[in-house]
Amino acid sequence: MDYYRKHAAVILATLSVFLHILHSFPDGEFTTQDCPECKLRENKYFFKLGVPIYQCKGCCFSRAYPTPARSRKTMLVPKNITSESTCCVAKAFIRVTVMGNIKLENHTQCYCSTCYHHKI
């Protein structure tokens, strides 16, 4: 019975990673095979309003591997998979107001650094 729980957990983890990857490609960018480098790109939605808003987009380092048994024993909540990654984030930005009341961050520099969305 315990074997089936572990097997189900691995399947669910794999499925969630696949879904995360699938949803991280907006508007048909899934068809591109290579991943562009981390750099400034113009936001196409705000470009329609005539306002040049730039965002950091691109790929950085990411990998996942099985957690070593020795490390798993010391965890408060043992996890079977360990991941390491860096994300394309803004090194510098300027706060701008668009359409009178919408406040945005217009990125001016990008680099690969800690993934802030992973931190809770």
Curated annotation (Swiss-Prot):
Keywords: Disulfide bond, Glycoprotein, Hormone, Secreted, Signal. It is found in: Secreted. The keyword Transmembrane does not apply. Disulfide bonds join C35-C59, C38-C88, C56-C110, C60-C112, C87-C115. PROSITE patterns: GLYCO_HORMONE_ALPHA_1 (PS00779), GLYCO_HORMONE_ALPHA_2 (PS00780), GLYCO_HORMONE_ALPHA_3 (PS50277). GO terms for cellular component: extracellular space; follicle-stimulating hormone complex. Its main location: secreted. Glycans are attached at N80, N106. GO terms for molecular function: follicle-stimulating hormone activity. Shared alpha chain of the active heterodimeric glycoprotein hormones thyrotropin/thyroid stimulating hormone/TSH, lutropin/luteinizing hormone/LH and follitropin/follicle stimulating hormone/FSH. These hormones bind specific receptors on target cells that in turn activate downstream signaling pathways. This is Glycoprotein hormones alpha chain. The lineage of its organism: Eukaryota, Metazoa, Chordata, Craniata, Vertebrata.
